[in-house]
């Protein structure tokens, strides 16, 4: 792609000059001693099989499936309970969802993170917070998703996947195509009841990822194992080819498993049983609302995601605020913002299509025990130990209890959050009004003693808030090592 890499080649020996463009290829045929261009190469390949006919007979667009009536929107009290159960905060509404429906863009904040890691926080954290996105560490972006939009695609296929190496089985498996992986509540109902319109092509089964609240300790490991067994049986014995993992049945008596945990568990269980390519996985969850959440669900195997509670929350925001946006338009802008955010995340690793990103697991786990990672997020890098399954269960049940108990002081408001900026009763921060004021005082007065107080305060905070650096200590040994 670079001119001048091969210098001193006489012009009379050059037959043609061009650059290798994105999405294009060339073949050097050593037997025939010639270079085959992109156009000739693809012309030869496309004539070998009736690909167009296969697509026409087996590729089904979700937009062509008739609409179905979805569940009713919950009342305001029920909506608030659901938001609390799934860990929504006032910051989520004000700094994420509201800007999304105003601009259709993924909100951008300042750099820098001065809050504890999820595993070291004394606040209840969602499982998504224990994962960090990987990125290609190069000086220029691997892909520019804006200027190289031509090679970017969020198209997803739901259902069984054909063997890419077996060209004799073409046209035998139906594929359900969606132009992007975020499903509205109406779209999800289309998939749930797809047998009403496409007899014999797809069979959809909804598996609840909720479990009944019990006074005694619930064994969450056995609940996940039961969920995986149901998924395996549905595919291997009953020929279901679309599974919907749903937490819609959450209520005062039923607690939802973290959607990411359920997704990773079922995805890897089906892989181990050799059944994953026989079925598509769709997630119906009230927990996911941000780009990071959606990327994690997709990265651990979800071909499509329906963040139903986000859509209900958008409707509530519009009804209460002065935002002049219709409900349908707000949903479209929210989906647009999520899509742009996903393209940005994919491009950081040089991935251009959602189909390549789905199940790729391009994350590091930080603060999860190796047992949890090995069992439910197999193959994910984890550098330190951390919380186990019981602690994840405890935090989930704590949020559920706070959502449905009668607490008159905070009954009608969401938790303030405090991740993005310092708030009383919010998440701990290293940079607080006290430390910032102390630094300003030290600089303006040029008083070293005040600066020492400031530095001691910062150092104490890194230990108290348990940052990894703050926990680092040298170990004294009795026998020095000779160097």
Segments from the language model and where they lie:
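Conserved short loop/turn motifs at secondary-structure junctions
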Residues: 116, 246-255, 280-287
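Conserved, mostly hydrophobic/aromatic
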Residues: 26, 247, 266, 297, ...
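Short, ordered loop/turn segments at secondary-structure junctions
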Residues: 31, 248-250, 286, 302, ...
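Active-site-adjacent beta->alpha loops and helix N-cap segments on the catalytic face
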Residues: 252-265, 313-323
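Loop/turn positions that initiate beta-strands
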Residues: 21-23, 28
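Alpha-helix-loop-beta-strand connector modules within alpha/beta enzyme cores
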Residues: 255-283, 333-340, 344
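Flexible, glycine-rich loop/tail regions that form catalytic "lids" or insertion modules at the edges
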Residues: 1, 5-7, 15, 34-221, ...
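Catalytic cores of alpha/beta
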Residues: 287-301
């Amino acid at each position: 792609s670079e001119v001048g890499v091969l210098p001193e080649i006489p012009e009379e020996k050059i037959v043609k000059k061009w650059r290798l463009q994105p999405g294009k290829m060339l073949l050097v045929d050593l037997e025939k001693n010639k270079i085959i261009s992109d156009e000739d190469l693809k012309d030869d390949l496309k004539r070998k099989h009736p690909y167009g006919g296969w697509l026409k007979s087996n590729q089904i667009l979700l937009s062509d499936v008739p609409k179905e009536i979805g569940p009713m929107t919950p009342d305001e009290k029920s909506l608030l309970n659901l938001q609390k159960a799934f860990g929504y905060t006032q910051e989520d509404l004000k700094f994420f969802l509201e800007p999304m429906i105003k601009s259709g863009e993924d909100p951008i904040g300042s750099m820098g993170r001065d809050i504890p890691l999820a595993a070291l926080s004394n606040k209840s954290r969602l499982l998504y917070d224990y994962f960090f996105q990987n990125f290609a560490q190069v000086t220029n972006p691997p892909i520019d998703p804006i200027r190289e939009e031509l090679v970017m695609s969020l198209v997803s296929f739901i259902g069984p996947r054909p063997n890419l190496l077996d060209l004799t089985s073409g046209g035998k498996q139906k594929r359900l195509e969606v132009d992007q992986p975020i499903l509205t509540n109406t779209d999800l109902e289309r998939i749930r009841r797809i047998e009403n319109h496409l007899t014999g092509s797809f069979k959809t089964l909804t598996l609840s990822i909720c479990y009944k609240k019990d006074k005694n300790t619930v064994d969450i490991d056995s609940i996940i194992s039961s969920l995986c067994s149901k998924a395996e049986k549905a595919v291997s014995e009953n020929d279901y080819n679309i599974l919907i993992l749903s937490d819609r049945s959450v209520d005062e008596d039923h607690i939802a498993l973290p959607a990411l945990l359920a997704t990773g568990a079922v995805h890897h269980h089906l892989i181990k049983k050799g059944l994953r390519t026989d079925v598509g996985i769709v997630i119906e969850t009230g927990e996911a609302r941000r780009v990071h959440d959606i990327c994690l669900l997709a990265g651990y195997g979800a071909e499509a995601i329906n963040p139903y509670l986000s859509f209900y929350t958008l409707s509530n925001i519009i009804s209460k605020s002065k935002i002049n946006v219709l409900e349908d338009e707000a949903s479209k802008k929210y989906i647009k913002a999520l899509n742009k955010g996903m393209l940005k995340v994919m491009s950081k690793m040089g991935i251009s299509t959602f189909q390549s990103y789905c199940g790729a697991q391009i994350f590091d786990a930080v603060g999860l025990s190796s047992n949890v990672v090995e069992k439910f997020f197999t193959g994910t890098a984890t550098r330190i130990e951390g919380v186990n399954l019981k602690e994840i269960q405890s935090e989930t049940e704590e949020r559920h209890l706070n959502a449905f108990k009668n607490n008159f002081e905070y009954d009608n408001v969401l938790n303030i959050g405090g991740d993005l900026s310092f708030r009383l009763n919010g998440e701990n921060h290293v940079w607080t009004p006290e430390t910032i004021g102390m630094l300003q005082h030290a600089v303006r007065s040029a008083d070293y003693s005040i600066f020492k107080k400031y530095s001691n305060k910062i150092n104490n905070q890194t230990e108290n808030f348990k940052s990894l650096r703050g926990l680092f200590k040298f170990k004294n040994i009795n026998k020095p090592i000779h160097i």
